[in-house]
């Protein structure tokens, strides 16, 4: 097979038109509508009508103005009584301000605070000084933290939530 080299055309537009006339594909005979080339919208496909009966309500400075405007339009349209906003919020404001929260309240609960002699939990009769894991057959296992020591000194067999998982399994 021999290949021939065609000289470059002087006018590209005319050259392309000549090639299209020689080739003449079937798709050139198809007629397309003169509308927009974009695909149809969902409104066109499903015959959905847009509801434009509600007028646009702009933002206003006062809620009272919005209440009177909306009540006038709803009473005339549907006959329903308008909903009114109570003058005072039924939810009381939160009394805690950021200034009243102490730094101690923001500490992690796993870091146990140390109690001094003036604290009501740490009394003079307290013998608990450090973390310990002792077993007394008459009392049972004792896992040490300041909260557990307070309850155990009062003859209450209780463990705090941090010491409970450390305790031995009871059968």
From Swiss-Prot:
Function as written in the Swiss-Prot or TrEMBL entry: Plays a role in viral genome replication by driving entry of quiescent cells into the cell cycle. Stimulation of progression from G1 to S phase allows the virus to efficiently use the cellular DNA replicating machinery to achieve viral genome replication. E1A protein has both transforming and trans-activating activities. Induces the disassembly of the E2F1 transcription factor from RB1 by direct competition for the same binding site on RB1, with subsequent transcriptional activation of E2F1-regulated S-phase genes and of the E2 region of the adenoviral genome.
Motif interval(s): LXCXE motif, interaction with host RB1: 106-110
Keywords, in A-Z order: Activator, Early protein, G1/S host cell cycle checkpoint dysregulation by virus, Host nucleus, Host-virus interaction, Inhibition of host innate immune response by virus, Inhibition of host interferon signaling pathway by virus, Inhibition of host STAT1 by virus, Interferon antiviral system evasion, Metal-binding, Modulation of host cell cycle by virus, Transcription, Transcription regulation, Viral immunoevasion, Zinc, Zinc-finger
Name of the featured protein: Early E1A protein
Compositionally biased intervals (Pro residues): 84-96
ZnF (unnamed) ranges: 145-163
Listed GO biological process terms: regulation of DNA-templated transcription; symbiont-mediated perturbation of host cell cycle G1/S transition checkpoint; symbiont-mediated suppression of host innate immune response; symbiont-mediated suppression of host JAK-STAT cascade via inhibition of STAT1 activity; symbiont-mediated suppression of host type I interferon-mediated signaling pathway
InterPro entries: Aden_E1A
A molecular function (GO) term: zinc ion binding
Region of interest called Interaction with RB1 in competition with E2F1, as start-end residue ranges on this chain: 40-48
Signal peptide: none
Highest taxon of the lineage: Viruses
Cellular location(s): Host nucleus
Residue segments, region Disordered: 67-96
Subunit structure: Interacts with host UBE2I; this interaction interferes with polySUMOylation. Interacts with host RB1; this interaction induces the aberrant dissociation of RB1-E2F1 complex thereby disrupting the activity of RB1 and activating E2F1-regulated genes. Interacts with host ATF7; the interaction enhances ATF7-mediated viral transactivation activity which requires the zinc binding domains of both proteins.
Family listed: Belongs to the adenoviridae E1A protein family.
């Amino acid at each position: 097979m021999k290949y021939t080299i065609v000289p470059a055309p002087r006018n590209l537009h005319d050259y392309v038109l000549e090639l299209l006339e020689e080739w003449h594909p079937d798709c050139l005979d198809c007629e397309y509508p003169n509308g927009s080339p974009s695909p149809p919208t969902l409104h066109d496909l499903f015959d959905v009508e847009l509801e434009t009966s509600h007028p646009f309500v702009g933002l206003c400075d006062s809620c009272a103005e919005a209440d009177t405007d909306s009540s006038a339009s709803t009473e005339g349209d549907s006959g329903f009584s308008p909903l009114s906003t109570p003058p005072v919020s039924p939810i009381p404001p939160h009394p805690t301000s950021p200034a009243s929260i102490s730094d101690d309240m923001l500490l992690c609960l796993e870091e146990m605070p140390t109690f001094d002699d003036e604290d009501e939990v740490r009394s003079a009769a307290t013998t608990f000084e450090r973390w310990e894991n002792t077993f007394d057959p008459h009392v049972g296992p004792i896992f040490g933290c300041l909260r557990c020591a307070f309850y155990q000194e009062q003859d209450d067999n209780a463990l705090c939530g941090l010491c409970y998982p450390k305790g031995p399994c009871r059968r």
